[in-house]
Amino acid sequence: MSKKLHIKTWGCQMNEYDSSKMADLLDASNGYTLTEEPEEADVLLLNTCSIREKAQEKVFHQLGRWKKLKANKPGLVIGVGGCVASQEGDNIRTRAPYVDIVFGPQTLHRLPTMIKQVQEGRGAQVDVAFPEIEKFDSLPEPRAEGATAFVSIMEGCSKYCSFCVVPYTRGEEVSRPLDDVLYEIAQLAQQGVREVNLLGQNVNAYRGPTFDGGICTFAELLRLVAAIDGIDRIRYTTSHPIEFTDDIIEVYKDTPEVVSFLHLPVQSGSDRILTMMKRPHTVLEYKSKIRRLRAARPDITISSDFIVGFPNETDEDFEATMKLIEEINFDMSFSFIYSPRPGTPAADLPDDVDMEVKKARLTRLQHVINNQSMQIGRAMLGSTQRILVEGPSKLDPMQLCGRTENNRVVNFEGPHTLIGGFADVEITEVRPNSLRGKFLRGENEMNLRIATAPSEILARRPDNVPDPLGVAAFTPH
């Protein structure tokens, strides 16, 4: 009888990536298979997020539910990972002593050993250290699940925005070696992946070491990934404006694989609030970067993050944010009411904006951006869009579903042989959350760029044997 694993994940795409790696790791090392039902599991893992308000209380509420399962199944192993685990450490076990394992984002690769030690009766295991990039050296080979895949290229953030917990929960910026990143993507491409999403808390700050002692910038990485045959779309998240440099903008001029969509968080349209947030850029600098980007890629759409009701935010500050939104014409946003995060500098500031004022500001901001999004959608009516076909439509299994470059969902009729590839579709209807289209052509009629076969990249990796530093030699041609 196989052992069962249940993972509950909250938070960002990095957490989703980490959870998939936990599943692969425990399958490869211990033979655990995933189950959607926690009642069936031998191991329960909660991968947490500390971004939202009352994150800790949400964790203990979930653990309380699992406590009942453990009462009926004493051998059940319960583990807590992610950013709340990194923040709280052994304090989690103080409040929930039935938790067996507490691990941080950088120590998930040690899970097989920690689970084994618990099962051997060696007591609870707590490891929330920051061993830099070690976890990537210990993970199993990547497995593709469809035409899109996420690849983590770096961890942590060194910007220390006053409201943000990431530097304290995931550590400072550490980039994966270039050849490791390219090798993972080449493996995924050989398995049929067509779109890769590069992940990092501050992804465009990537500075990956190369085999010859050099450093690969994010702009250089984008071009190298684009050269891998089969990878015809590149996304990345999340970017920081201060790291969105001219060399990255130049990539948009000559690298069509990088999609015409960018998520670039600004947080506020007020320089005064940005200073209080310790964001090292001004509104003018942000607008300048967007202007130059649109000159390089005129059809690009932009999304962003906004925090409303930051301490001491006045009506004038908020109106400055609304002015920026109107000037940039954002396609979408992740927008939140400010709430203090324990341990951050902003938590020491008086939370002096009335909650009703915060709610009203958020409602107005979201209403404007939703209207902008609908206008952008309507402008796509009658246009031909290249769709990466992901599978049958959830609305109608007889139809297909895919995404445009600017991340719009499109449903259309077409042969199921298109799944996993690209299709050109004429947009015939615009709906609030999706588009409808008419199939025009498959990728056999397209002139997709071919540069470097994945097998060539894999062959350059010398028998998968790392050097003493754990970095294999990759020589880009």
Swiss-Prot record:
GO terms for cellular component: cytosol. It is an enzyme of class 2 (transferase). The lineage of its organism: Bacteria, Pseudomonadati, Pseudomonadota, Gammaproteobacteria, Aeromonadales. Transmembrane segments: none annotated. Monomer. [4Fe-4S] cluster 1 binds at C12, C49, C83. PANTHER family: CDK5 REGULATORY SUBUNIT-ASSOCIATED PROTEIN 1 (PTHR43020), MITOCHONDRIAL TRNA METHYLTHIOTRANSFERASE CDK5RAP1 (PTHR43020:SF2). Binds 2 [4Fe-4S] clusters. One cluster is coordinated with 3 cysteines and an exchangeable S-adenosyl-L-methionine. SUPFAM superfamilies: Radical SAM enzymes. Residues 3-120 form the MTTase N-terminal domain. CDD domains: Radical_SAM (cd01335). It catalyses: N(6)-dimethylallyladenosine(37) in tRNA + (sulfur carrier)-SH + AH2 + 2 S-adenosyl-L-methionine = 2-methylsulfanyl-N(6)-dimethylallyladenosine(37) in tRNA + (sulfur carrier)-H + 5'-deoxyadenosine + L-methionine + A + S-adenosyl-L-homocysteine + 2 H(+). One of its GO terms (molecular function) is 4 iron, 4 sulfur cluster binding. Its cofactor is [4Fe-4S] cluster. Catalyzes the methylthiolation of N6-(dimethylallyl)adenosine (i(6)A), leading to the formation of 2-methylthio-N6-(dimethylallyl)adenosine (ms(2)i(6)A) at position 37 in tRNAs that read codons beginning with uridine. Residues 143-375 form the Radical SAM core domain. Keywords: 4Fe-4S, Cytoplasm, Iron, Iron-sulfur, Metal-binding, S-adenosyl-L-methionine, Transferase, tRNA processing. This is tRNA-2-methylthio-N(6)-dimethylallyladenosine synthase. Residues 378-441 form the TRAM domain. Its EC number is 2.8.4.3. [4Fe-4S] cluster 2 binds at C157, C161, C164. Belongs to the methylthiotransferase family. MiaB subfamily.
